[in-house]
C-alpha cells in the first residue's frame, strides 16, 4: 500500500511567485505536464487587478522548485471574468488553451450567459511564452459542461472530461439523490 507523505516545503508556489497585480485569492486549478525539453510546465488560472482572467505559465526542472515564465494569455475583459481550470497542449500543429470563464456574456450564438467554456487556438511565441490567438470559440454550447481537462492517451488521442454541472445550478441539489453532478 502506498503511503503518502506531505512535502515539507509545501506549498511549492506562494504569493511571492505571482506576477505583479495578480490576485492572491483567485489563483487556482493547476494543470501540470512534462514537455519534450525535460521540463515540467504548469498553467494556473488567475485574476489580475482589472478583475478579468488570465492564465499563468510556470516551469520546473524537478516538479518542486518552480519559476514564473509568463502570462500565457490574458482576458482583457473580453470573455467573462476569472478564468478557471486551464489546460494547455499542442494538437494538430497548433497550441490549444482551454479554460472556463466565470460570468460570460453572450456574443451572438457563440457564448451564453453565466459560466462557460473557452477554447483559444493559436501559436505560442517561443521567446515570450505567450499565446498568439487565431481562433476563440466555445467548447460546448450547453450550460452543464465546465472545467474540462484533457489527457494524452498512449495511442496519441487527446481525451477530454468535464464537470457536468455549473456554478449557477450547484445550489439546487435534490436531497433524496445519492449523487449530484458528475464528470462526463
Positions of the model-derived regions?
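Beta-propeller and closely related beta-sheet repeat lectin domains
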Residues: 28-31, 84-87, 146-149
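Structural secondary-structure packing elements that flank or coincide with functional cores
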Residues: 153-154
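Beta-rich carbohydrate-recognition and catalytic domains
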Residues: 1-29, 34-79, 92-141, 162-184
Amino acid at each position: 500500500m502506498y503511503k503518502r507523505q506531505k512535502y515539507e516545503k509545501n506549498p511549492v508556489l506562494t504569493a511571492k511567485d505571482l506576477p505583479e497585480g495578480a490576485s492572491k485569492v483567485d489563483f487556482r486549478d493547476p494543470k501540470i505536464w512534462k514537455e519534450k525539453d525535460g521540463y515540467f510546465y504548469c498553467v494556473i488560472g488567475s485574476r489580475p487587478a482589472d478583475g478579468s482572467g488570465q492564465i499563468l505559465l510556470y516551469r520546473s526542472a524537478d516538479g518542486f522548485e518552480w519559476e514564473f515564465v509568463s502570462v500565457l494569455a490574458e482576458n482583457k475583459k473580453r470573455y467573462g471574468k476569472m478564468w478557471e481550470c486551464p489546460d494547455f497542449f499542442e494538437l494538430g500543429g497548433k497550441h490549444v488553451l482551454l479554460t472556463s470563464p466565470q460570468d460570460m456574456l453572450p456574443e451572438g450564438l457563440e457564448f451564453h450567459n453565466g459560466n462557460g467554456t473557452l477554447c483559444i487556438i493559436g501559436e505560442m511565441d517561443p521567446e515570450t511564452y505567450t499565446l498568439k490567438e487565431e481562433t476563440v470559440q466555445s467548447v460546448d454550447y450547453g450550460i452543464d459542461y465546465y472545467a474540462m481537462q484533457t489527457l494524452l492517451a498512449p495511442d496519441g488521442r487527446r481525451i477530454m472530461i468535464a464537470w457536468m454541472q455549473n456554478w449557477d445550478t450547484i445550489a439546487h441539489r435534490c436531497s433524496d439523490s445519492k449523487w449530484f453532478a458528475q464528470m462526463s
